[in-house]
Amino acid sequence: MFMKTDDFDYKLPEELIASYPLENRDASRLLKLNKQTGEIADYKFTDFIDFINPGDLLVFNNSKVMLARLYGSKTTGAKLEYLIERIKTPKLFETHIKANRSPAIGSEIYVEDTLAKVLDKDGGMYLLEIQGDKDIYQLMEEFGHIPLPPYMKRDDEEFDAERYQTVYAQDLGSVAAPTAGLHFSKELMQQIKDKGVDIAYITLHVGSGTFKPVQVDDVESHKMHAEVISVPVEVCQKIRQTKENGGRVIAIGTTSVRSLETAGQNGQIEPYQGETDIFLYPGKKFNVVDAMITNFHLPKSTLIMLVSAFADKEKIIKAYEHAIAERYRFFSYGDAMFIF
């Protein structure tokens, strides 16, 4: 079945793009969508506690956002801007480089105050090796900026270092926050535990490809970027137990969805460590996830395709139209949906 990328477009008034977070994480709004009936209802995010039951399992992505934006220069003094994509060893890393003229392979360039050698280039991605004493972790710690999404159209500010990070972030490696998790305050996490709802953590390091628009007309011919994930054995055990006892597996964010569905591709959830380029679009089956919390996604993005695969495209577009009419806030610092 031929699916056009344009079918996943919608018109969003620019003022509904949330450039700043709310004062309190859990003060955002929550649109509840029943994927069977299409019924839509408006709530506060803190009401989520009433939609989950003892015996349910919430699966969070514990990846931590790197201070991945760095600056530097060529030895000539020409300015460079870096977006660190993936760290291979403390002194070897893949990065995007914004420059008037691309640095040549074999050349030496400065990352902040430290010299690095350009070992290789693949498309827009450079492989750099640090020549000085500092490693990339030290450089990020000393000079790094939170890499806010391009649509926020602003430089990062001090509060972003805390607010563009989930309260349970642990494993450093993402270029963008797993944003559905940003709504969970420490108090709400405690309430969830107190209610007897189980919690598990997977890791998916979000790559910058998450912001890449789909550039082909035919959805199925889009090639997904690869991201590193880890679905540990104890998470698989919890999922099997939850299913056996009649509970629901509720994924917090599309990164958790993609991780769990990668690990469950054969119909049975198995531990998984490695890369995933899973692409979930209408017609694809979900083997693990029963419900999800997710933010509102960019038009024509792979993520609006994912939620359309889960809940049916017409229902999603209708929910988005409702959210626009009700002035919900969109994208990373915006409001959320609970699709069940």
From Swiss-Prot:
* Known catalytic reactions: 7-aminomethyl-7-carbaguanosine(34) in tRNA + S-adenosyl-L-methionine = epoxyqueuosine(34) in tRNA + adenine + L-methionine + 2 H(+)
Does the keyword section mention Cytoplasm? yes
- Gene Ontology annotations of biological process type: queuosine biosynthetic process; tRNA wobble guanine modification
Give, as in the UniProt entry, the pathway in which the protein acts: tRNA modification; tRNA-queuosine biosynthesis
A cellular component term (GO) from this record?
A: cytoplasm
Annotated compartments: Cytoplasm
What EC number(s) does this enzyme carry? Answer: 2.4.99.17
**One of the Pfam families matching this protein, by short name:** Queuosine_synth
Its predominant location is cytoplasm
- Entry keywords, A to Z: Cytoplasm, Queuosine biosynthesis, S-adenosyl-L-methionine, Transferase
| Superkingdom field | Bacteria
Alphabetically, the GO molecular function entries are: S-adenosylmethionine:tRNA ribosyltransferase-isomerase activity
Q: What does the UniProt function comment say about this protein?
A: Transfers and isomerizes the ribose moiety from AdoMet to the 7-aminomethyl group of 7-deazaguanine (preQ1-tRNA) to give epoxyqueuosine (oQ-tRNA).
Protein family (similarity comment): Belongs to the QueA family.
Subunit comment: Monomer.
Name used for this protein in its record: S-adenosylmethionine:tRNA ribosyltransferase-isomerase
Record gene name: queA
